[in-house]
Amino acid sequence: MSDHIRAASSPSRHGSEHGWQHAVTPQQRNRILVATWMFTLCFMILVMVMLGGATRLTGSGLSIMEWAPLMGTLPPTSQTEWERLYALYQKIPQYALVNHGFGLDGFKHIFWLEWTHRLWGRLIGLVLLLPLIFLAVTRRIERSLIPRLILIFVLGGLQGAVGWFMVASGFFPDSTAVSPYRLVVHLSFALLLYSALLWTALSVLNPEPRPLPGTVGLRRMSAVTLGLVCITIIAGGFVAGIHAGLDYNTFPLMDGRLVPEGYGEGHRAMFENIPTVQFDHRLLATLTALTALLTGLIGFRRGGNARRAVLPLMVAVILQYALGIATLLSVVAVPVAVVHQGMAVLLLTAAIVTLHSLRGAGRTASINAPASSH
């Protein structure tokens, strides 16, 4: 990502008899400002994903039964309000079947995490909307970018609605958790919003791709890697949704078998059968890691800018694979699992940055253009 920042902030050069004079143009300053705003939003979404993971892992997600985008901003301020919310929670199956009798103090414990998760979502909305208005009014955003940013804002609003749609599935009779399908949709919307912001920010910083002749194959491999990362994260969402990580806590075998007993049983085995869901996630993670490392090796052989483009991807995929194993062996210990979920976003980041850095694959530098440093 540093290459993109250097590209945006690289000064224009004006020849003079005394040497070079350096200046950053107003357009470059505006691009850096806009990109910094979008990178801030990306960081906030990363935190949001980790908060969501902690909320799910601690069973806190169903503690607030009301959808109040504005009035729900403030927490309860009186004993009467706490008791009212606790009485609502006592009506859902999760209380009766999982947390029966844990008292108002126990309810407060799970309430605060879900409330923080929702509050952070509201803050993301404000950080998205208010600077967007300011930057547009002061004409710091290039006009061609405004429709895309409005679409991103709409996507952010939809994500909030999808979040409630997911939570509501946990209020059904005999339900003690949210629907894994709705959980995956909620996660997918978050990552789609994150990816759109990140790609746009990188493009704002570096609107003209750097020529990288002879790297078309590397770009294709990086695109395949990004696709595999996305599919593997979605598969991980189903692992989380049906709590498949609580079984088969050995690696690399599953109860002493490469392919676990019961694999593929049921017409929705890919989404609801625990051995199938966990094995598929393991297989996809391994395929993703191998593809990313192969992409990295190709980039290293090319050297120069290609090597710099693939290095973050190689580091991220190794760390994420190790965290996945650690999460499994720890029987989904909450701190390890939350870091694993956050690292998935960082791996997605590395894959996007790598692909974006290779936009100039196959292009040759102009004769009059300054040679890029290697």
Curated annotation (Swiss-Prot):
Function of the protein: Catalyzes the conversion of heme O to heme A by two successive hydroxylations of the methyl group at C8. The first hydroxylation forms heme I, the second hydroxylation results in an unstable dihydroxymethyl group, which spontaneously dehydrates, resulting in the formyl group of heme A.
Top class in the EC scheme: oxidoreductase
Gene from which the chain derives: ctaA
Pathway: Porphyrin-containing compound metabolism; heme A biosynthesis; heme A from heme O: step 1/1
Cofactor(s) of this protein: heme b
Record-stated family: Belongs to the COX15/CtaA family. Type 2 subfamily.
Organism in which the protein naturally occurs: Granulibacter bethesdensis (strain ATCC BAA-1260 / CGDNIH1)
Transmembrane segments: 32-52, 118-138, 149-169, 184-204, 226-246, 283-300, 309-329, 332-352
UniProt keyword list: Cell membrane, Heme biosynthesis, Iron, Membrane, Metal-binding, Oxidoreductase, Transmembrane, Transmembrane helix
Single Gene Ontology BP annotation: heme A biosynthetic process
GO CC annotations on file: plasma membrane
Enzyme Commission number, as recorded: 1.17.99.9
Sequence segments annotated as region (Disordered): 1-22
Binding site for heme: H281, H340
Predominant location: membrane
Localization per Swiss-Prot or TrEMBL: Cell membrane
GO MF annotation: an example: metal ion binding
Protein name: Heme A synthase
